[in-house]
């Protein structure tokens, strides 16, 4: 019997926390579906979502100012369990009649939590035990405000040396507050605390599993598509691979895979993709040579958003042409949940677009194909689990992400055939050395960026003006935040040496040491 994987669900209201997406991933790992929405979302949307529980995220602001963000007041009146984390706890306390003040001594980093009442959230959870027999937990704090007076009906359930009210609960109304962050790995028991809230307090049944997601996706695809054919564009990335495999599992020979050779793929990528998918997928694959078409469309375009939208337009037009030849009505896309989050805007406009994703906002409004996006609700790690469950090779599943517009957005400014050729070579050298040194799977994404600037150098006995290549490598769990990868200097020196010696047009190599935020992972 098929499970309803969305039957039990948690709503996470985002107050601007860098950890908001991490909360969502933790809830998913518990086995329960959840969605992330901005904290100013309207009441109708929340009621339509019909959550079994609500989590209020942390945030960078202070509750002590009148103009800062608040939770929708009605969520405290609908009989739904609510968990406030950091800022979420503070706004809950303030809105329900408590007091919040700036603390004289902010807490950032590790703290030891003393549990005063373990009921519900902390039941059976401890890292150590105090001499008085109280459970002690190692937790991660990041706050400058504290709840100084509890709202009516609440009691203190935990404290630290600097926060007498580090956790609070109204057991009757099932409202809970945590001043620390249970979602981060620096709180070792955080997953268990969240599971207590989601499973025991909200009484959610954990149906959100890889097996059930596959079953649900197959059923959904079959119901939508019927006997019609579907085109899926292959890019060599994990998202398109899992999308194609999932669609193929659902409708078999009704799937036609299309690989568009845009001229903007990585070195030798077309041959590699054809080999992998014809061997492992067993589906029909059509390769379309569209190099001239893409170059013509991108000529004179330097704005990153325009390049993304043009790439999306050209992709769709190619698919539509193939669809007309084959009488195909549907386009399968590898849009994933972080794409949706980053491309979303609230009705109030308080959450702004970071960049337009090729799989979301880059699509033409007059697209003639109907769209299916079986991965739209999934984070990247969930997509990879699906791929492994579907039998795709691990090398493909753990391949670094590659943007839909390809090298067009790794060339700063206007794209040219010369720039593409230089970048392909530099990128291939970087990836080859990462694999040879066993660093490839230690970083989450790595690539080269072409900078259309010339810098003076010396080759032989002569001054030489050549282009600049930037190398980018990051470590991340969910691609919502990322840290630059601290690769050994000897390794970077080797890569740099190869690039400037093997690519005559390049005179300088630099390494990007910027986290996300403030930067995005891609340069454009």
UniProtKB/Swiss-Prot annotation:
Active-site residues from the entry: 86, 181, 183
Domain of life according to the entry: Bacteria
Disulphide-bonded residues: none
InterPro entries: Class_I_gatase-like, GATASE, GMP_synth_C, GMP_synth_GATase, GMP_synthase, GMPS_ATP_PPase_dom, NAD/GMP_synthase, Rossmann-like_a/b/a_fold
One term under GO cellular component: cytosol
SUPFAM superfamilies from the UniProt entry: Adenine nucleotide alpha hydrolases-like (SSF52402), Class I glutamine amidotransferase-like (SSF52317), GMP synthetase C-terminal dimerisation domain (SSF54810)
Keyword Nucleotide-binding: yes
Primary role: Catalyzes the synthesis of GMP from XMP.
Protein name: GMP synthase [glutamine-hydrolyzing]
Organism: Coxiella burnetii (strain RSA 331 / Henzerling II)
